Amino acid sequence: MFQGASSLNLDGKGRLSVPTRHRDALVAMAQGQVTLTKHPHGCLMLFPRTEWLQFRERIAQLPMSAQWWKRIFLGNAMDVDMDATGRVLVSPELREAVGLTKEVVLLGMGNHFELWDKATYEAHEAKAMQEEMPAAFQDFAF
């Protein structure tokens, strides 16, 4: 399970250096093989390949009414291997699609990660913090 936020920088070639605490888990789970695709909220999702295969099957089974979402998730998916130093290449197409600049935030989301442009993430988080908490959280004790 992946959790926590990491502020990182993409290098000049668009590579993300995966934090050590996650790197070891990605190697153990999927031999460093990951899949990146678009998320509808304006970020990228980064899956260990084993988790991606399960997600892909669920998406592929959606009805024709969800065809455009299938295209968004599956049509933009890119398989990448983490290199020997723990870096993942984020393609120019995916970087451009979600507006990734040099400064990014990697969020652990359980079985996958979200990769956000730092300024975009901070703006979305600030807006969410100003809004009322969703009903799904009303039974939680904090």
UniProtKB/Swiss-Prot annotation:
GO terms for cellular component: cytoplasm; nucleoid. Keywords: Cytoplasm, DNA-binding, Repeat, Transcription, Transcription regulation. One of its GO terms (biological process) is negative regulation of DNA-templated transcription initiation. CDD domains: MraZ_C, MraZ_N. The keyword Transit peptide does not apply. Forms oligomers. It is found in: Cytoplasm, Nucleoid. This is Transcriptional regulator MraZ. It comes from Delftia acidovorans (strain DSM 14801 / SPH-1). PANTHER family: TRANSCRIPTIONAL REGULATOR MRAZ (PTHR34701:SF1). Pfam families: MraZ. Residues 5-51, 77-120 form the SpoVT-AbrB domain.
